[in-house]
């Protein structure tokens, strides 16, 4: 019976070590999520600068067209989508860690229940104290993981809302860019017609 108790204590320590590893992995996921949030925020700030460029003089529009802003906007849109997908994958991974922790805790409780059934033949007080200590720490770690999961869920929801706003802004900027290009084209055509009109009378005068 003492071997069974020692085995349960050993299993409990092993489960606790696995729990700590899962906790470290969860913290790493949270750090990665925070880094993604910073990258998305930086891209949104970069996108906010674009409207100022569209408000410059018409003479600058021609120079801006060399950089193909609609392509840049499309690239930023794709990058934001990738960041959103990566963030969701991190959140799913965190939930998988949480499920694993709950499974570990369930197995641990089952082992302790088996011990309690057989405790009549042995003084199980030392084991019960060890169980209480390990159980409290495991419950604390699970609570932390649950809190991390809740934070990441809220972050994903906020990112979804911000992403919709960014998409709307990008569509607006693309429309403005199209209109500016049309104005530039009309202006260029008018200038060309004016030059041709001035050249024609001059040619007739020379004759």
UniProtKB/Swiss-Prot annotation:
Pfam families linked: SIKE (PF05769)
Chief location bin: cytoplasm
Cytoplasm recorded as keyword: yes
Stretch forming the signal peptide: none
Keywords linked to the UniProt accession: Coiled coil, Cytoplasm
Domain of life, per lineage: Eukaryota
Localization: Cytoplasm
Gene Ontology process terms (BP): negative regulation of hippo signaling
Recorded coiled-coil stretches: 70-102, 164-192
A GO term, aspect molecular function: protein kinase binding
A GO cellular component annotation in the UniProt record: FAR/SIN/STRIPAK complex
Cited function: Physiological suppressor of IKK-epsilon and TBK1 that plays an inhibitory role in virus- and TLR3-triggered IRF3. Inhibits TLR3-mediated activation of interferon-stimulated response elements (ISRE) and the IFN-beta promoter. May act by disrupting the interactions of IKBKE or TBK1 with TICAM1/TRIF, IRF3 and RIGI. Does not inhibit NF-kappa-B activation pathways. Associates with the striatin-interacting phosphatase and kinase (STRIPAK) core complex, forming the extended (SIKE1:SLMAP)STRIPAK complex.
Similarity comment: family membership: Belongs to the SIKE family.
Assembly description: Interacts with IKBKE and TBK1 via its coiled coil region. Interaction with TBK1 is disrupted upon viral infection or TLR3 stimulation. Interacts with CDC42BPB. Interacts with SIKE1 which mediates association with the STRIPAK core complex composed of PP2A catalytic and scaffolding subunits, the striatins (PP2A regulatory subunits), the striatin-associated proteins MOB4, STRIP1 and STRIP2, PDCD10 and members of the STE20 kinases, such as STK24 and STK26.
Name of this protein: Suppressor of IKBKE 1
Biological source species: Mus musculus
Upper taxonomic lineage: Eukaryota, Metazoa, Chordata, Craniata, Vertebrata
Gene name per UniProt: Sike1
